[in-house]
Structures are given as C-alpha cells and as structure tokens.
C-alpha cells in the first residue's frame, strides 16, 4: 500500500466517516426509545431483525415508502429540522394504516452533500418521535454523505415502514355500499403535500414567515407536522367494522377517496360540513385557486377519511373523539351517475 505523505483520504474527498460515527452515537438514545420487544439485536448490524408479533394468527406484511417532498425546502429556508422527521414517518404509517395494518418497524434514508451532525440529529430525533407516536420501532437507516450531489445545507429524506395485519382483517373497501357514511378526521395543516404550490404562493405574497397568523407564527403553521392517526384508528378497528379508509395526501380529497371505493359508487362530500383551517383559505385567496383545484391539491383540513355503516357512526365518532381526534360526518356513499367522478364535493 502507498504510504507517501501526500496521500489523499476519504475525508479529503468530502466524506467524513468520523462525523457519521458521531451521528450514530447521537441518535442511539432516540432509537432506543422506540424499541418493541419483537426487535432482535441492536443498531449497527448489517440487517435489522424483527420477530412477527404472536398476536397475529395469519399475518400479512404490509409495506410503504414515502418522502416529505418540497416541504424540505421550507425547512432549509427556516433552519427548522425538528419536525420533518415526524412528517416522514406519518406519510408511510398512515398509508399502511388504511389497509388495517399495525406499523411494526421503520427505516430511514438521509442523503446530503456534507453531513452536519447537529442538523441530521434533529431530523432523526423527529423520526424517532414519529415512530413513538406510531408505536413502531426505528430499527435502522442509512446516512449517505455524497459530495457534489446536494447544495450546501440541503438534504433529502425517504422512509420505509413494514406493518402487519391478520389476513381476514385486511381492509380493501370491497364491502363499502350505498348509504355508508364518510367520516373525516382533522388534519394538522397542509401535512406534506402541495408544498410546491405553498412555496410559490408564499413567494408571490411576500408574507413574513415570522408574522402572526391567527395566534401562531406563520412559519409554525406551514411547518406543522403531519398528523399520525395510528393509535386512534387501531383502537377503532378493535371496536367497529371499518369498511374503508383513505389517507388524504397528494391529490387531495377528490383523488384519494376513490382509491378505496368499489366500482359504481361515489362518495358525495358536503362542502361546509367540516372546519377548514385558515391556512387553506389564505392559500386559496393568494392564488385565486378554484374550489376544485383546492380539493384535488390539498387535504383542506381532512387528513384521514373513514367509511363506516350508518349504524356505526355514533360509536365511531365517540371513540375517535375520546382519543383526541376531531371528527366530522362529511358525506355519504351513493350510486355513481353516468360519467360522474367517484368523489364529488357539493
């Protein structure tokens, strides 16, 4: 091997192994708080081991992956990195939840040009917080320092979740019928979708991100983390026959609800049947956005849709309210008209 004085190291090329090691030590306590008894082994192995919980008699594994999108651009602009990790977890765990799956474990991918240990630790602390809210274990991840790939101070995130449900308890929407009721659970804000438009409207309006917006700094309103519905919904599934659910993400209400409806049925959602947060009214006003565009771009205050029989509405609302969720009866399922969309807002 060459041992000349002018040899070049990996660090000289822009990859700081010591910084990566320091990050691992910083985040170990965060990950430890998320552990479940089914986790076998600790952080640092080549693979993560997880024993399927014995409570599942005929388990089906359900997986999901997602990112945070251009909401990260606002995080860079505001130097606010403590909540985007919650967003990352929420986007995946809420997705598999709609099929009746309990999230079991989560992995993350953090990519940057130059690793800033403090920033990365804030992000991972948020990921761990999201995992705690979801009851799933943060069992591993990848930190990729790639010089020249990202602008200074920027990074990208991806998350991966695996959950499980008993095969006969999977929810696919196939039992949804005319007369069923559409319940909407409140969102925390824009969650993690529509942020390319949000950022454009912020730029066009010239709004001061530090200004007061209905009693909160505007920056906190637009950066509010995606709500995680796992624990309340899992309790609901134990008590009530849920026919279908939709996580309201990219595509808004009108594009996501149809994903769980059988052919020939339409969800008729009643405009004004729930409280729309001021942020969405502000966005609509700044961009002169049509109602139709709002409902297919943003969640407009509804982060999760639950479809149940009319006879189960009162019990479902009571249980969800007791778990801290704000829930409204926002529509009904009916026969689909000729040429009609599967979700309409009237």
UniProtKB/Swiss-Prot annotation:
CDD domains: PurM. Belongs to the AIR synthase family. Keywords: ATP-binding, Cytoplasm, Ligase, Nucleotide-binding, Purine biosynthesis. HAMAP family: AIRS. GO terms for biological process: 'de novo' IMP biosynthetic process; adenine biosynthetic process. Gene3D superfamilies: PurM-like C-terminal domain, PurM-like, N-terminal domain. Pathway: Purine metabolism; IMP biosynthesis via de novo pathway; 5-amino-1-(5-phospho-D-ribosyl)imidazole from N(2)-formyl-N(1)-(5-phospho-D-ribosyl)glycinamide: step 2/2. One of its GO terms (molecular function) is phosphoribosylformylglycinamidine cyclo-ligase activity. It is found in: Cytoplasm. This is Phosphoribosylformylglycinamidine cyclo-ligase. It comes from Methylobacillus flagellatus (strain ATCC 51484 / DSM 6875 / VKM B-1610 / KT). The gene is purM. It holds the Pfam family AIRS_C. It comes from the Bacteria. One of its GO terms (cellular component) is cytosol. Its EC number is 6.3.3.1. It catalyses: 2-formamido-N(1)-(5-O-phospho-beta-D-ribosyl)acetamidine + ATP = 5-amino-1-(5-phospho-beta-D-ribosyl)imidazole + ADP + phosphate + H(+). InterPro entries: PurM-like_C_dom, PurM-like_C_sf, PurM-like_N, PurM-like_N_sf, PurM_cligase. Its main location: cytoplasm.
């Amino acid at each position: 091997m060459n041992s000349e004085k002018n040899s070049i190291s990996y660090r000289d090329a822009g990859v700081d192994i010591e910084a990566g090691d320091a990050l691992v030590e910083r985040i170990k306590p965060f990950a430890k708080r998320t552990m479940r008894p089914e986790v076998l082994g600790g952080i640092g192995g080549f693979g993560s081991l997880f024993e399927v919980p014995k409570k599942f008699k005929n388990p089906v594994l359900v997986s999901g992956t997602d990112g945070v999108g251009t909401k990260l651009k606002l995080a860079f602009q505001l130097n606010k990195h403590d909540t985007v990790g919650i967003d990352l977890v929420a986007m995946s765990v809420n997705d598999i939840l709609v099929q009746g799956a309990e999230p079991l474990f989560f992995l993350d991918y953090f990519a940057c040009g130059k690793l800033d240990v403090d920033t990365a630790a804030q992000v991972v602390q948020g990921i761990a917080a999201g995992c705690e809210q979801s009851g799933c274990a943060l069992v591993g991840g990848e930190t990729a320092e790639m010089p020249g790939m990202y602008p200074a101070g920027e990074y990208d995130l991806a998350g991966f979740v695996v959950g499980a449900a008993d095969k006969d308890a999977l929810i696919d929407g196939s039992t949804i019928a005319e007369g069923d009721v559409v319940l909407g659970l409140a969102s925390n804000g824009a969650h993690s979708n529509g942020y390319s438009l949000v950022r454009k409207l912020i730029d066009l309006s010239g709004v001061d991100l530090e200004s007061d917006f209905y009693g909160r700094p505007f920056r906190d309103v637009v950066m509010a983390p995606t709500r995680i519905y796992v624990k309340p919904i899992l309790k609901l599934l134990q008590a009530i026959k849920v026919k279908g659910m939709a996580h309201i993400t990219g595509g808004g209400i009108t594009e996501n609800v149809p994903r769980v409806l059988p052919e020939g049925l339409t969800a008729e959602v009643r405009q004004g049947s729930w409280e729309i947060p001021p942020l969405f009214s502000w966005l609509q006003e700044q961009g002169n956005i049509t109602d139709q565009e709002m409902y297919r771009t943003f969640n407009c205050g509804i982060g999760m849709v639950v479809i149940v029989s009319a006879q189960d509405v009162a019990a479902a609302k009571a249980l969800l309210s007791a778990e801290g969720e704000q829930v409204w009866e926002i529509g009904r399922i009916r026969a689909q008209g000729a040429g009609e969309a599967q979700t309409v807002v009237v």
